[in-house]
Amino acid sequence: MPLDGYRTEGFIAEGLFTSQDEIDNSPEQLLGTVVRPGDIKYRDINGDGRIDNDDKAIISPYGTSPRIQYGIGANLRWKNWDLGVFFNGSAKRTIIAGNITAFGTNDYNVMQFVADRAWRLDNPDPNAEYPRLGLTPADNANNMETSTYWMRNGNFIRFKTLELGYSFKYGRVYLNGDNLA
């Protein structure tokens, strides 16, 4: 059981539908909208020929808290000079990127980088970074389900702090930077 008592449950994505023929020959997805080419295709876990809440599985054993959080630092001195560095990060963490407003805000504005990387009729890329974009939340319902399609690796390490200083007899001058990389 995860430390925070939470596991991520959702559908297992099998890519994007590339044609109406593929949709017609796949298990029926009963997720509140008409499925179209470019929509996310989900696995029929229980084999009943339809995709519904009974086909959800634990898609990440990690909850909202990373399993490992770490930091490492060093302070060096040489004559009147000093240098301090600190790195921190987390590991064993999965994030779900489905809520990054890929489908627009309440005004339905879509960021250009999303539109450029989405599945479109004029560019039917089966490996598109984003599924087909619809006009309304109801039109996007199939693609807004929590699934492995939206899972991302949440591990990171960052260069948190750098400080370089020089000490005088009665004081110290230093430069400090935070969140450098």
Enumerate the predicted regions with their spans.
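Extracytoplasmic gating/loop element in the C-terminal half of outer-membrane beta-barrel translocons
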Residues: 2-27, 33-37, 90-178
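Repeated loop/turn-to-beta-strand initiation elements of outer-membrane beta-barrel proteins
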Residues: 80-84, 171-172
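Outer-membrane beta-barrel domain signature
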Residues: 59-63, 150-153
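Active-site beta-strand/loop architecture of penicillin-binding DD-peptidases
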Residues: 55-57, 64-68
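Acidic carboxylate motifs that coordinate Ca2+ or other divalent cations, activating on Asp/Glu
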Residues: 44, 48, 52
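Hydrophobic, lipid-facing positions within transmembrane beta-strands of outer-membrane proteins
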Residues: 68-74, 81, 159-164
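A generic beta-sheet turn/junction motif
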Residues: 76-80, 89, 168
